[in-house]
Amino acid sequence: KRPNPATAKRLRRNARPRMGDAWAWAGRRIRPATPDGLPVATARSFNRAPGTVRITGGTIKGRKLDVPAGDGVRPTTDRARETLFNVLTNRFRKPGGSSVLAGARVLDAFAGTGAMGLEAWSRGADFVAFVEAQSTHFATLCDNLRAAKLPTDAGTALRNHEGLKTTDRSIDIIIADPPYEQGQALLTALLARQSALWHADTLLVWEHPRGGGTEAGFDGWEPVHQT
C-alpha cells in the first residue's frame, strides 16, 4: 500500500540527517569572565575516509582535494566538515550579525590536505595560514592550494608554527586537528608559544578523539561549544 503524499513527505523529512546526528549539542558563544579569558569550541572526531575529499560550501564548493597515502592520514569526512562549518557559520556571529568567518584570518594549525583552511576561505575567510610539518603531506597540501587557485595574498603554506611570526596581523580563528596521540600537548605548546597572535575574541576549534581528555582544557581559554 502506497502512503498518501502527506505521509510520504513526512517520512522523507524524518529520514534526513540532522545536525544532532553528528553533534551532541551546540551552545552559544560565552563572553570571557576575565580579561584574559579566550573562547574555545571543541569538536569530537568523526569517521575518516581515504582518497579524495571535497569542499562542501562557498565559492569553491565541490572542489576535489587529494589525500596523501599513508596510515597516518585521516582527513575529516566531507559530512563532518560541513557540519562543523555550519556550526561556525550559524552559531558564532560577529557584532552586527555577520558570520565569524567573514573576512577572518584563519590558522589551519595541522593542515594535512588543507581541507579545513580551504573550506574556511571558500566560506568567506580573508586569509588562511596552513601549517603542515610532514614533508609528503606538505607537498600534497601545496598541490591542493594550487588546484584550488588560492591567491597568494589569501594564504600561505608553512612547515612549522614559528613561521607564523612572519604574519603581520593576529589570528581570528584557530582550527586544530593535531595527531591524536599527542594532540593536547601539541596544541597546548602552540597556544603558549604563539600567544602574541591571539586576541580577546580569537576562536579555537579543536578536533579530538571521542571521549579524549578535554576536561583539563587550556589556560586562558573557556569552552563555549562541546560535543
Please place each PLM-identified region on the residue numbering.
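Class I S-adenosyl-L-methionine-dependent methyltransferase catalytic core
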Residues: 1-227
